[in-house]
Each structure stands twice: as C-alpha cells, then as structure tokens.
C-alpha cells in the first residue's frame, strides 16, 4: 500500500479513536458500558496495528502436485462454469480438478459442466466430474475427491467463486515456509453493486480479511481458512478424513462449518496464514432472509469450533486467545447493552442515547477505516453495518447459541448469480 494511503488510514483511525475515547469515558465512565468501550478500543488498536505490520509471502513457489476440489449443490449453471474456467486459467499448473455434484435436484449446472468438459477436451484433460446420487453435504462431496487424489496440496474453491489467475501461485508462496500448513486468500463480493446489503457485506469481508486475518496471520494463527479460496497440505486432510466426514457435536452429526474444522486440523500441525495477494470474488446473499440463514450457520460453527480452539490453550495459547477475545467481546456487548437499558444508575437520557449511537457509528468507521482508500463512498455506509451488527446480527448470534443443537441450519437451495 502506498505510504500516502497508509498515513491517511492511520491519521483517520487516530482521530476516530480519540472521539471514541472521549464519548466512552466522559459519558459512561467506569460503568459496564465504559469498561466494554475500553476493551473494544484496545482490541481495535491491536488488530489494526498488527494488520499494518503484515506483509504477504514472496518468492517463487516450490513444485507441488495440486488438486482443486469444487463441491456443488443446486448451483447456478453459469456460475459453476465461470468457477471452473477461473480454475483452469491458473498460472500455476493443477494436476487434477474435481467437480463433485452433491446430489443436486437441479442438474442444469452439472450437465453444463459435463458438456463443456467433453467439448473442450484439450484444456479439460485433468477435470474429473462426479455426480453423487444422494445429497450428503459439502464434507462428503469434498471427501470423494480427497480420497481419490494423491496430490501434495489441496485447493478448495466454492462453486460460486471466481479466483484470479495468479491466486493459486500466490497462495503457494506461503508454503515455502515449511511450518505453514494452510493458507487463505482475500475475498470480496462479486455482486457488491447489487444492493445495500451486498455493499455492506463487501465492507465486512474486506475488514475480515484485510484487517482481522492479516492480524491473525502475523501470529501464524488465522482462525478460519475461507471456503472460496484456501489451500491445505495433504498431511492436514488425509489423516483426518474420517473424522472430518463423521464429526459430531453434542451427540449430533455436523454437516457444515467445514472451513473452520479443516483450519483447526491445520492449526494442530503448524501455522495457518493469510495471503493478501491471492484474490477471489464470490456471490453473497442479496436477500435478508438468505443472509440471516447464512449468518446463523456461521454463528453455530463459530461457537462449536471455538470450544475446540479454547481447548488448545496449553498447546497453542495464541489460537485460544484470539478465540477468547472474540467470544468475550460478544458476551460483554450483550451485558453492556443490558446494563445500558436496565441499570437505573446510568440514567439513560437523550444525550447518552445519542452518544451511544455515535459510538456505534464511530466503531463501525474505525473497523473499516482501511476501506476508505478503496471505496470512499461505500466507506461512509459503514455506520449502517454497525446498526445491522448491533440490532440484528448480535441478537441472531445469541439465538444461534441458544439453538446450537438444532441441525437444520438452512443449507441453501438456490443461488442467483450477478454479472
């Protein structure tokens, strides 16, 4: 990033944090809301500070036998074809490309893929297409490919994702470090321009990768290698394959949360990292109902795998600390809001209510300050994501925790692609 842009981000962040400190300490003092504010400000400073120290891996990748695995279920036909074409266009050669249809009721996508592979024989010699008769879930679709490949490295790609031509080559640079066992790239919303929700989602994605994963990568412990674009060494996948397919939680089979699960397997062996120069675009939900279903699934996966991560506090304390921070911030926010609403000692009036809403807005701007140099106009929408986060996503997260044993997690039935 040019020094001018980096300086602008730092100065803007310092300015926003200064306002945040004033509103927090002078209006809420040592109350629960004030204490939460202090911890939140500290956490924001740590994450942004670490992200500024982040540098992508460089050098030329070693020679690996790489297999791409693309599971698909009721995917839009053109979307799946575009995904395949983007994988075929990689600058780093792939030994195998597996497309596994997981028992889709709508077979248009897999039929289009089969026609394309049969027609474009010269460029599709290494493409293996498989149709499962029964829908068993993404894990089993991936496992079908894992079990049949002798690759050194597995590239996982979602069926609604476009990966940039050099994405695999850039990811593999991280494997020059033999202690790295998994890596993920940078994700943005392909349909960002569709509506307000997709714009807000893209803002969230950019922060989740450009700040959060960049900060975690500096410690060698990103918590989630994202499904749209990640690589894993063979040693991560094959020894854990049966455990991956048959994972249970509270006595019930687990059908999603595969990205976090595979990342935890990699963490057991070594480092997990983020490579900002490996990029992809993916379709995101454009309807609130679909978006909330997605968030509900992710929330349940977050809580389940967080329990596993916290258990690593002796073997891998950094992973446990990142996880504990995320869980504690969520719980403290719930307590702070409850205290603000029901504790008469705080004496909530219009001024403090306005200050509290201002804090929400400024925190959202702080979280996404780096987005200012990428999409300045969209950056100004950040406070709207703050409102969505506080009044919709946080209650949903609490609901997800309370219903974590419910295995009907709303797997998508249909995906719409936007050009």
Swiss-Prot record:
GO biological process: one example: extracellular matrix assembly
Places the protein is found: Cell membrane
Pathway, per record: Glycan biosynthesis; hyaluronan biosynthesis
Catalytic activity: [hyaluronan](n) + UDP-N-acetyl-alpha-D-glucosamine = N-acetyl-beta-D-glucosaminyl-(1->4)-[hyaluronan](n) + UDP + H(+); N-acetyl-beta-D-glucosaminyl-(1->4)-[hyaluronan](n) + UDP-alpha-D-glucuronate = [hyaluronan](n+1) + UDP + H(+)
Annotated SUPFAM superfamilies: Nucleotide-diphospho-sugar transferases
Co-factor requirement: Mg(2+)
GO CC term (a single one): plasma membrane
InterPro entries membership: Glyco_trans_2-like (IPR001173), Nucleotide-diphossugar_trans (IPR029044)
GO molecular function: hyaluronan synthase activity
Transmembrane segments: 8-28, 33-53, 318-338, 345-365, 376-396
Keywords linked to the UniProt accession: Capsule biogenesis/degradation, Cell membrane, Glycosyltransferase, Membrane, Transferase, Transmembrane, Transmembrane helix, Virulence
Membrane topology note: Multi-pass membrane protein
Enzyme Commission number(s) of this protein: 2.4.1.212
Protein's UniProt keywords contain Transit peptide: no
PANTHER family (UniProt xref): HYALURONAN SYNTHASE, MANNURONAN SYNTHASE
Function: Glycosaminoglycan synthesis. The hyaluronic acid capsule is involved in the pathogenicity of group A Streptococci; it may be the major virulence determinant.
Record family assignment: Belongs to the NodC/HAS family.
Name of this protein: Hyaluronan synthase
UniProt organism field: Streptococcus pyogenes serotype M6 (strain ATCC BAA-946 / MGAS10394)
